[in-house]
Amino acid sequence: MKTLLYSRNGRADAVLEFRDKPKPVPQDGEVLVKLEASGVNPSDVKSRAGRPFAFDFVVPHSDGAGIIEAVGPNVDGARVGERVWVWNGQWQRQYGTAAEFIAVPSAQAVHLDDAVDFETAACFGIPGLTAAHAVNLLATTKCERVLVTGAASSVGHYVVQMASMEGKQVIGTASEAKADTVLEAGASSVIDYRKEDVGEKILELTDGAGVDAVIDMDFYSTSRLVSSSALRSHGTIICYGSNDMGEIPVAFRDLLFKSLTLKFFLVYELLEHERSAAVERLGAFMQSGKAKTRISHVLPFEEAVKAHELVESGNANGNVVLKV
């Protein structure tokens, strides 16, 4: 089968190459998926660029969609021919979705309705499940107003839609060029984080009340809200990333005396019940008829280098997907 792989870290144009590899055979509890689309996420390009790996080569990408071609032992044969989307395809595995086929545990191939195309479904795994779990966590808090950072990102765009559908007043951060995208997704206001002080603008937009929660993609930047009245007492920060992965100082006094809650999660490591709940929310969201998946580029498999470069540039206004 045709596969995209890298055997060392580096620039996309220097390390990505196509190779022919044996078609996988589904093992006990697995399904073999003939892939139609492979989603390219920021975590995929970061892994290729510089994260150590334990294999002699890696076939990248965790998200994808296609059709089940075969099943291994202890999997219902009725699944053959089923349209599915795949999550965690390459998490702690050698073979991801940048290939013509992938064998994964049956639970990692989720049923896909006929109404949803493969390119859209290839955006569900990391962006969709991250957003769904974040909003599930939000649902456990008393929240009327929520700040969504990176609201024009693939994850943030889903979060804005889901939270606004739940009746929350959503304030998003985004560049001026992407503000309309965030407003169309359901945000009441957009803060240009490049030109405006986020904390001060929150207070202005809420008449000094602040927000009850933050769903955050970059704790390095957002941590300063811990000590700001822009985040109300008894507020919650739900965080799934940070541009600085080192030590980030926060004022314990403010955490304590404001009775703040910090919730962090990695979408790859959700507990089984958390994953199931996220899949359920994402499915309901997609069936609502209101869901919007913003796809910036759909490229042929042969243009994988360009896809990685687009994601790395930050200039893609939406998801980047490869047709396999």
Language model: regions and residue ranges:
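NAD(P)H dinucleotide-binding glycine-rich loop of Rossmann-like/cofactor-binding domains
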Residues: 15, 88-150
